[in-house]
Design a protein with these regions (language model features):
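Active-site cores that bind ATP or allylic diphosphates and position pyrophosphate for catalysis
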Residues: 176-323, 330-335, 384-408
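Non-catalytic terminal extensions that flank enzyme cores
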Residues: 20-21, 25-28, 35-73, 96, ...
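N-terminal Rossmann-like or analogous alpha/beta NTP/dinucleotide-binding catalytic cores
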Residues: 51-188, 285-286, 290-303, 408-409
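Proline- and acidic/polar-enriched loop/turn elements at helix boundaries
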Residues: 101, 132, 174-175, 310, ...
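Short secondary-structure transition/capping segments
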Residues: 143-161, 185-192, 219-228, 351-366
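Residue-level detector of structural "landmarks"
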Residues: 29-30, 273
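Short, mixed-charge aromatic SLiMs
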Residues: 104-114, 316-320, 367-375
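Extreme N-terminal basic, low-complexity initiation segments
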Residues: 1-22
Length: 409
């Protein structure tokens, strides 16, 4: 865990005790006097005293997770990722957690959460912990809450540890200024994908007086993690093999909290994976460059990271990555068109090199093999044929074709 010490500098930059502004309200971050956050144990301590957590000790049983964002309908690309994540966990005799990543209130809708649960069950995917059977208001399992919108107090505690260690600073840059930085030479950081544009640490270098000036001008700050200078992260990806990145390649100092008070994805997902005992994360390769950021957060919080597997993405016939705008390829649209769930999962399993079968039968077969065969998965993105929905209904859909490596994202 983080030691009980507070740095007075952020990599050589003067740091003052700040009056925090969050969602238009001032607050003081907890100090490290009482210790740090233990996301796996029962006691969580901070400068405000000791808090009791409902989080049980981390289990050694393998654990995978399904972590949809309820911002729209699930599509074939989501089904591909969730099927592989589910099978990878079941192949090791592991449990599966369903977590709704509804951290952004402006985009998330409860009706989409319910639709997602119905779509997952339609595919034959179940879970051991998560929202109740109807995806209503109750949570079922020892690691609740299973909705990020309800876990703010846990993110707050993790943030306090990072702040007490001198690794957090306020960022007053506006969206317009950030867009200008992204458009500047070397500002876009080619290949960052969804990890975001490179941030050169503009507000990290502000003096205390400059920070106070921005506060007086009414600027609300976001909060960024000050990445250690020259920091690198390495990991062995189950699909892509050994990976090595500098944090600068992944965008530099990244946001932990937005200026409107919404917690950022990077912090939320690390806290949730740690407290839920997630041991393996299967997700699209478009998230690859988020992994070094998350590994750094795991290390700073003293938590053990999961194993990662970044799988290739599905693309439409034109080569565009599947997204929620592909309404005809949503699971709801396929169901209404008369496509059977067994046809979808069997087709996806064959595309992954796993043979045919419904998820339950595939899980039994893989369990007998003793491990998930990552080596069978394709290494490049896959392009669907035209009219794949109708072909799935007929039962004669051709397998997706590999895309050239340069079109993989």
């Amino acid at each position: 865990m983080l030691k009980d010490s507070t740095f007075e500098n952020i990599d050589g930059v003067e740091r003052e005790t700040l009056s925090r502004r969050r969602s238009g309200r001032c607050f003081s971050a907890a100090s490290s006097d009482g210790g740090g956050v233990n996301l796996r144990g029962r006691n969580i301590t901070s400068g405000h005293g000791q808090f009791q957590s409902e989080i049980p000790l981390r289990e050694e049983r393998p654990c995978g997770r399904l972590a949809p964002s309820p911002t729209g309908p699930l599509h074939l690309g989501n089904a591909w990722a969730f099927l592989l994540a589910w099978l990878a966990a079941r192949a090791e005799g592991g449990r599966v957690v369903l977590r709704m990543e509804d951290i952004d209130p402006a985009r998330s809708r409860p009706e989409w959460a319910g639709a997602i649960c119905r779509d997952l069950r339609w595919l034959g995917l179940d879970w051991d912990e998560g929202p109740d059977a109807g995806c209503g208001m109750a949570d079922a399992g020892p690691h609740a809450p299973y909705r990020q919108s309800r876990a703010g107090r846990l993110y707050e505690r993790a943030f306090a540890v990072l702040d007490a260690a001198g690794r957090v600073y306020p960022c007053y840059c506006t969206r317009k200024e950030l867009r200008a930085l992204a458009g500047a030479p070397h500002g876009a950081a080619d290949g960052l994908g969804d990890a975001g544009a490179f941030y050169p640490g503009t507000c990290r270098r502000l003096s205390p007086a400059e920070r106070r000036e921005r506060e007086r001008a009414g600027r609300h700050s976001a909060w960024r993690l000050a990445c250690p200078e020259g920091a690198t992260e390495s990991f062995d990806d189950a699909v892509l093999g050994p990976q090595h990145f500098t944090l600068a390649e992944c965008g530099g100092d990244f946001a932990l909290r937005r200026s409107d008070g919404v917690w950022a994805y990077q912090l939320a997902v690390v806290v949730d994976d740690a407290r839920m005992g997630v041991t393996q994360v299967v997700r699209g390769e478009d998230i690859l460059l988020s992994t070094p950021r998350q590994l750094l957060l795991f290390r700073l919080l003293g938590e053990r990271p999961p194993r990662y597997a970044h799988i290739p993405l599905l693309h439409d016939a034109a080569g565009e990555r599947l997204a929620k705008r592909h309404h005809s390829l949503s699971l709801g649209a396929l169901r209404e068109a008369g496509v059977r769930p067994e046809a979808v999962t069997a087709w996806l399993a064959r595309a992954a090199g796993l043979g045919e079968g419904v998820p339950a039968d595939l899980a039994v077969r893989l369990r007998r093999e003793g491990k998930f065969p990552w080596e069978r998965l394709p290494r490049t993105g896959l392009r669907l044929s035209d009219n794949v929905a109708e072909a799935l209904r007929r039962g004669d859909a051709p397998l997706p074709e590999p895309l050239p490596a340069c079109k993989n994202t």
